[in-house]
A protein has these predicted regions:
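N-terminal DNA-binding recognition helix of tyrosine site-specific recombinases/integrases
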Residues: 1-21, 67
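C-terminal catalytic core of tyrosine-transesterase DNA break-rejoin enzymes
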Residues: 10, 53, 59, 63, ...
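DNA breakage-rejoining catalytic core of tyrosine-based enzymes
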Residues: 13-16, 27-47, 95-117, 133-136
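Catalytic-site neighborhood detector that most strongly recognizes the C-terminal catalytic loop/helix
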Residues: 35, 92, 120, 145, ...
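Active-site/catalytic core of tyrosine-dependent DNA strand-transfer enzymes
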Residues: 39, 91, 116-161
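Conserved catalytic core of the tyrosine transesterase superfamily
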Residues: 49-57, 80, 85-87
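C-terminal secondary-structure termini that scaffold catalytic or DNA-interacting sites
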Residues: 83, 102-110, 114-119, 125, ...
Length: 235
């Protein structure tokens, strides 16, 4: 809805976007995030044929954490195959019968995502399979509703718990947190405007961080005590 009014403000000289005056509903510190583990995602993706459109779409959603609107706006020109980088610089949505491609919602949403080698190869194979694809053509010329429908059907086939398309983004973050990736790096990868958004949304997924701090202090204190003892002996 915000994107729709933003478009209206730009194109039809709407004086103000009313959505920007409405506070976000609910608690931003959401402890009820719904996401898949890596095993659950693998169970889901295995229901699709590798190399197909939807297979690659879900691969990119899970392994980059991009938003669905950002994914649907990606063109061949946004992919740097030499540097393994994906440029996020626009977003797509559909209103009525019109396809709208506009700038991302915040300055921080403009970003370059480093992608793993295997994902780069999957994208390259898909692009090469569409010979003559123009650099400015959308990789995935479908609408969000089609992605949602496909995901719902494959969830039933896979027998995994039901989540939304946007929850795949949460799944990406949960995976990164499990691997020990720092919040600041996650913020930049997701395109969050403020680190507080990242921490308020995902901070509770760091259950072992306080224990790590205590262990770190124990180690430092032990080193300090050892050092003091050695100094006394030398004196």
């Amino acid at each position: 809805l915000t994107s729709l009014f933003t478009h209206a403000a730009k194109i039809y000289d709407l004086p103000v976007n009313p959505c920007k005056k409405v506070k976000r509903m609910g608690n931003s510190d959401s402890r009820s995030l719904n996401f898949w583990t890596l095993d659950e995602y693998k169970q889901f993706i295995q229901t699709m044929e590798p190399g197909t459109r939807y297979y690659l779409m879900f691969e990119m959603l899970f392994w980059t954490g991009c938003r669905i609107g950002e994914l649907l706006a990606i063109t061949k020109a946004d992919i740097n195959f030499e540097k393994n980088q994906l440029s996020i610089n626009k977003t797509y949505y559909r209103t009525g019968m019109q396809d709208i491609i506009t700038e991302p919602k915040t300055k921080q949403s403009f970003r370059t995502i480093e992608i793993p080698e295997f994902l780069k190869e999957e994208i390259k194979e898909f692009v090469d399979g569409h010979y003559g694809m123009p650099d400015t053509e959308r990789l995935f010329p479908v609408v969000q509703e089609a992605v949602q429908h496909k995901m719902k059907r494959q969830i039933e086939l896979a027998g995994v718990k039901k989540i939304r398309v946007h929850d795949i983004r949460h799944s990406h973050v949960a995976y990164l947190i499990e691997k020990g990736v720092e919040p600041l790096l996650i913020r930049d990868r997701l395109g969050h405007k403020d680190i507080r958004i990242t921490l308020n949304t995902y901070g509770h997924l760091y259950p072992n961080q306080q224990r790590k701090i205590a262990n770190l202090l124990d180690n430092e204190n032990g080193n300090a005590v050892t050092g003091l003892g050695e100094e006394r002996d030398e004196c």
